[in-house]
């Protein structure tokens, strides 16, 4: 897999990425896709040992964060399969990068 570097300089984007990866199931999903390549939901759920509905929730969160992509395809027998693949990424999170990202947060601090 070719790695690309995405700059997570926007505060909201950085929060979405960190939140998406802060769950052990989602980390396992990214790992399975990174190692095994693109896969469809049913097979991926079996591979990592969680239910399809739960996997759908985690894939949605990962897709919203831009860490995975999906593509609906027809199988040989005419069934629609939703394939997921990991988006190549590399992030370097430094204190300076966090400070810059914090300047662009849209959420107001709680008082």
Regions found by a protein language model. Name each.
Residues 59-60:
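Short, hydrophobic-biased segments on the C-terminal half of alpha helices
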Residues 70:
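Short beta-strand "wing" residues that participate in macromolecule-binding interfaces
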Residues 53:
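Key DNA-contact positions within bacterial/archaeal DNA-binding proteins
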Residues 13-50, 73-76, 80-85:
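N-terminal helix-turn-helix DNA-binding core of bacterial DNA-binding proteins
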Residues 1-12:
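Long, low-complexity, charged/polar intrinsically disordered regions in eukaryotic proteins
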Residues 66:
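Glycine-centered, phosphate/nucleic-acid-interacting loop/turn motifs that mediate DNA/RNA or nucleotide
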Residues 35, 75-111:
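Conserved segment of winged-helix/HTH DNA-binding domains
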């Amino acid at each position: 897999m070719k790695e690309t570097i995405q700059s997570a300089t926007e505060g909201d984007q950085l929060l979405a990425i960190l939140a998406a990866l802060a769950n052990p199931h989602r980390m396992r999903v990214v790992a399975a896709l990174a190692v095994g390549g693109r896969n469809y939901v049913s097979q991926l759920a079996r591979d990592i040992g969680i239910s399809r509905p739960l996997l759908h929730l985690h894939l949605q969160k990962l897709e919203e964060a831009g860490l995975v992509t999906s593509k609906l395809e027809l199988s040989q027998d005419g069934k629609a399969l939703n394939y997921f693949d990991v988006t190549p990424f590399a992030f370097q999170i430094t204190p300076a990068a966090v400070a810059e990202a914090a300047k662009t947060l849209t959420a107001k601090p709680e008082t």
